[in-house]
């Protein structure tokens, strides 16, 4: 964490460059690699720390407080080492056998499929929104398995860089620096050992668990994946808060006879409200992850009720973070609108992150309410 803290000012200074490039600068990715961040969720057998997931998300929060796009990509790329740990040992050797620093991008939206063939699958598709794909040597792509013309499973296909192309299409209003371009796969054979069923992850029968037995790898996918999306947004809220307080401390309000913003009692109220909500968002998000992890460390299972609570609070944390950024942005004055200012960038980045499917509040709230009534839940993202 000390090495990461030392890097934050540099990431903050590069935030505009990151946005202009529409991808994370190579120097930033190299520096993050050197801090050991990407090894946090990597198995010990491959030189990783297989760490407490709260430590990982705390690091993500810090990175995102300096640069939203860098935090977003770091979170997503970083969690893929956790996902790869659940694949077969052979798949892990394929990726990490020669280089344990290899990075993996993803797109889990079913924008392609795999046709069953002898020894594996023939995969075709165009997967949008693969954040950080320019910095990855492999991709994990979600989609159905098709057999006899019918979908029989939903899986992740693990595919090396030489077997797909990247279409540079990412030109957007928020999270511009994430390089979330489209991964295109055409008639690529993927062997069986490089395919992992989401069902196997959910019921803890993933083949990687035979060797990677640390508690972190038994965390529910329905907690890990959504938290990976929300943690950087909460980090952006912390960054927006710091930027707002600094801005208000210097701001003179032209419309109020030169009154200093820091002397405005209403400005102080908004700061207090936003600060409280941001802290509440983080406490809920990290607290549920900590509770689940503590149970697994103790050798116990994570009850379904806790998994539902984690999803409920994860979308609530995202909502709280974004509402707080809105409150701060609305009271920052016209100077905060200028291109290059951090507050407007955090505002755009957080709202862009909000549209991710994992942040759909109604879906998570309906699941929680359904569970409270003791009714069956069919949603798999829990």
From Swiss-Prot:
Molecular function (Gene Ontology), one example: acyl-CoA dehydrogenase activity
Top-level class of the enzyme under EC nomenclature: oxidoreductase
S-S pairs: none
InterPro entries: Acyl-CoA_dehydrogenase, Acyl-CoA_DH_C, Acyl-CoA_Oxase/DH_mid-dom_sf, AcylCo_DH-like_C, AcylCoA_DH/ox_N, AcylCoA_DH/ox_N_sf, AcylCoA_DH/oxidase_NM_dom_sf, HsaA
GO CC annotation, single: cytoplasm
Similarity section: Belongs to the HpaH/HsaA monooxygenase family.
Job of this protein: Catalyzes the o-hydroxylation of 3-hydroxy-9,10-secoandrosta-1,3,5(10)-triene-9,17-dione (3-HSA) to 3,4-dihydroxy-9,10-secoandrosta-1,3,5(10)-triene-9,17-dione (3,4-DHSA) in the catabolism of cholesterol.
Subunit relationships: Homotetramer. HsaAB monooxygenase consists of an oxygenase component HsaA and a reductase component HsaB.
Protein name from the UniProt record: Flavin-dependent monooxygenase, oxygenase subunit HsaA
């Amino acid at each position: 964490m000390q090495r990461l803290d030392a890097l934050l000012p540099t990431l903050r200074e590069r935030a505009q460059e990151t946005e202009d490039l529409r991808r994370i600068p190579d120097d930033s990715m190299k520096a993050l690699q050197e801090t050991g961040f990407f090894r946090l969720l990597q198995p010990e057998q491959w030189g990783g720390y297989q760490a407490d997931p709260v430590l990982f998300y705390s690091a993500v929060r810090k990175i995102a407080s300096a640069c939203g796009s860098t935090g977003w990509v770091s979170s997503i790329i970083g969690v893929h080492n956790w996902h790869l740990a659940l694949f077969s040992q052979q798949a892990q050797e394929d990726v990490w056998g020669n280089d344990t620093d290899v990075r993996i991008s993803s797109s889990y939206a079913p924008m392609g499929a795999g046709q069953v063939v002898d020894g594996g699958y023939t995969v075709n598709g165009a997967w949008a929104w693969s954040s950080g794909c320019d910095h990855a040597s492999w991709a994990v792509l979600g989609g159905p398995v098709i057999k006899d013309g019918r979908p029989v499973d939903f899986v992740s296909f693990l595919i090396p860089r030489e077997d797909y192309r990247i279409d540079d299409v990412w030109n957007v209003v928020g999270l511009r620096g994430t390089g979330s371009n489209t991964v295109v796969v055409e008639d690529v054979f993927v062997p069986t050992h490089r395919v992992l069923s989401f069902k196997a992850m959910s019921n803890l029968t993933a083949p990687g668990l035979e060797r990677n037995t640390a508690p972190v790898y038994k965390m529910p996918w329905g907690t890990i994946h959504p938290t990976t999306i929300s943690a950087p947004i909460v980090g952006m809220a912390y960054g927006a808060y710091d930027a707002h307080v600094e801005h208000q401390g210097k701001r003179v309000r032209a419309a109020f006879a030169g009154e200093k913003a820091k002397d405005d009692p209403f400005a102080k109220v908004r700061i207090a409200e936003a600060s409280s909500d941001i802290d509440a968002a983080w406490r809920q998000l990290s607290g549920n992850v900590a509770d689940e992890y503590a149970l697994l460390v103790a050798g116990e299972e994570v009850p379904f009720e806790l998994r539902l609570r984690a999803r409920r609070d994860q979308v609530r944390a995202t909502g709280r973070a974004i509402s707080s950024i809105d409150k701060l942005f609305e009271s920052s004055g016209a100077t905060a609108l200028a291109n290059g200012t951090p507050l407007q960038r955090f505002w755009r980045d957080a709202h862009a992150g909000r549209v991710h499917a994992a942040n759909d509040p109604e879906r998570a709230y309906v699941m929680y309410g359904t569970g409270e009534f003791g009714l069956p839940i069919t949603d798999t993202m829990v």
